[in-house]
């Protein structure tokens, strides 16, 4: 369970003011008002929870979009002790950020390898049918220039490579984004591609947050048969 965020405020002496704060979820604890808010389930957490439940001691996992290393670290955490995580990102800043994050967490260097190259080229590094899982978190590098983001032109070939790289029984996950900056082209193109995958070979789950905004991150999961 994710850790709750704690908000505090001075304890008012007036009952009316106390009632006002109660409308916003604050309650008296000792000499202060306290409100605890557990974070909403996020698309990233949803996908991570699914993979953790689905995979038992995977030996080879791929983070196809390293970003700041969150998914890379997650995969290192669920991979078997003798296993390995392979990460890809086209931005050197992302590779450096991921490496720093893993080092801060104390992940042994032998547990992972990072490649500053397109995820569409992952079959140059990974043999077909050998990966237990491949994770994609499309969009842009958090905290970096939003003018640099993934597009359908590279995402579709990367997904094709991932589906070839993963073993039967393995999983490919993809979180799709849309919005004012990146538009809807990648999201719609990827969805069309996923929905056209043959049922005899794949099961595709599109897991939208039905009461969130239309531009909310959209997790997709592909199970290879």
What do these predicted ranges mean?
Residues 2-12:
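Conserved GNAT acetyl-CoA-binding A-motif
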Residues 30-37, 183-225:
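Class I S-adenosyl-L-methionine
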Residues 65, 168-176:
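Conserved beta-strand signature within the Rossmann-like core of class I S-adenosyl-L-methionine
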Residues 135-158:
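Mobile active-site "lid"/loop adjacent to the S-adenosyl-L-methionine
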């Amino acid at each position: 369970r994710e850790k709750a965020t704690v908000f505090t405020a001075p304890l008012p002496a007036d009952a009316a003011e106390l009632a006002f704060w109660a409308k916003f979820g604050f309650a008296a604890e000792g000499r202060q008002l306290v409100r605890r808010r557990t974070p909403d389930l996020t698309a990233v957490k949803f996908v991570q929870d699914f993979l953790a439940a689905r995979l038992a001691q995977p030996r080879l996992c791929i983070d196809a979009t390293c970003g700041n290393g969150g998914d890379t670290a997650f995969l290192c955490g669920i991979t078997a002790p003798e296993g390995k995580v392979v990460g890809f990102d086209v931005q050197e800043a992302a590779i450096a950020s991921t490496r720093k994050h893993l080092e801060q967490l104390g992940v042994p260097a032998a547990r992972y390898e990072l490649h500053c190259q397109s995820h569409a080229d992952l079959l140059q590094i990974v043999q077909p049918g050998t990966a237990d899982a491949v994770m994609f978190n499309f969009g842009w590098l958090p905290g970096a220039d939003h003018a640099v983001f993934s597009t359908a032109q590279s995402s579709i070939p990367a997904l094709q490579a991932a589906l070839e790289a993963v073993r039967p029984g393995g999983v490919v996950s993809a979180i799709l984004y849309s919005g004012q900056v990146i538009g809807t082209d990648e999201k719609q193109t990827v969805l069309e591609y996923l929905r056209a995958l043959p049922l005899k070979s794949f099961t595709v789950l599109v897991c939208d947050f039905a009461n969130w905004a239309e531009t909310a991150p959209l997790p997709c999961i592909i199970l290879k048969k």
